[in-house]
C-alpha cells in the first residue's frame, strides 16, 4: 500500500465512513462501546450526532446493543431496517444494483471482505468501501472523481433514506444517532460532490 498522506478533511471522511461501516456490519462489543463513549463531537449537526452517540454508548451494554442490533437488522423474518441498495432501489434483495456494484468493484480492484456473509450492497460494506477508497486501503487513495462516481452510482440514490429510516426506527436507541450521523454524512457528501 502506498502510504501517501491524505488531507485532514479526507481523513475525517474516511474515519466517519469506517465508523458507520463497523457499526452497521457487526454488533459493537464492549471495546467499541468504550471507544464510542469517549468520542467528542465538535459544533454543528455532525458533532451533535457524535455527542448523542457517545452519551448513549455510555449507558449500553454488549447484551443490550446486541438485542437492538438483532431487532433492527435481523429480526424474526426480517429486521426493521434492510440496509441494502437492492432493497431500497427495487424492493427486493440481490437485484441489479448488487450486480452493478460487483462490476464496479471488479473494475476498481476492490475485493469482497473475507468471511463476510452480507451482500456487498449492504450500507456498512459500502461505507467501508468509501473509507478504503479515501484512505488508500485498496492500494492508494482513489481520485476524488472516482469516489464521486462511485458514491453517485451506488450510495447517493438510497443511503440517506436508509439512514433516515434507521434514525427513526422504533427499536433504535444506540442506532438512532448512528442513523443521524449517516444521514448527515450522506448529505454533506452529496453537496460536496455536487459543487466539485
Residue ranges and their predicted role:
Residues 1-196:
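Surface/interface-facing alpha-helical segments and adjacent flexible terminal/loop regions used
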Amino acid at each position: 500500500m502506498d502510504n501517501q498522506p491524505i488531507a485532514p478533511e479526507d481523513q475525517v471522511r474516511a474515519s466517519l465512513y469506517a465508523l458507520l461501516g463497523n457499526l452497521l456490519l457487526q454488533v459493537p462489543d464492549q471495546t467499541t462501546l468504550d471507544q464510542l463513549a469517549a468520542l467528542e463531537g465538535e459544533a454543528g449537526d455532525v458533532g451533535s450526532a457524535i455527542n448523542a452517540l457517545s452519551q448513549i454508548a455510555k449507558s449500553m451494554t454488549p447484551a443490550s446493543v446486541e438485542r437492538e442490533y438483532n431487532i433492527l437488522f435481523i429480526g424474526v423474518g426480517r429486521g426493521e431496517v434492510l440496509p441494502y441498495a437492492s432493497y431500497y432501489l427495487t424492493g427486493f434483495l440481490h437485484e441489479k444494483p448488487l450486480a452493478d456494484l460487483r462490476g464496479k468493484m471488479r473494475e476498481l480492484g476492490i475485493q469482497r471482505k473475507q468471511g463476510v456473509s452480507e451482500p456487498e450492497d449492504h450500507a456498512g460494506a459500502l461505507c467501508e468501501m468509501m473509507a478504503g477508497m479515501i484512505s488508500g486501503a485498496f492500494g492508494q487513495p482513489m481520485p476524488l472523481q472516482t469516489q464521486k462516481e462511485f458514491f453517485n452510482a451506488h450510495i447517493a440514490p438510497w443511503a440517506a433514506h436508509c439512514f433516515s429510516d434507521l434514525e427513526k426506527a422504533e427499536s433504535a436507541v444506540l442506532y438512532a444517532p448512528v442513523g443521524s450521523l449517516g444521514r448527515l454524512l450522506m448529505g454533506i457528501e452529496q453537496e460536496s460532490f455536487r459543487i466539485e
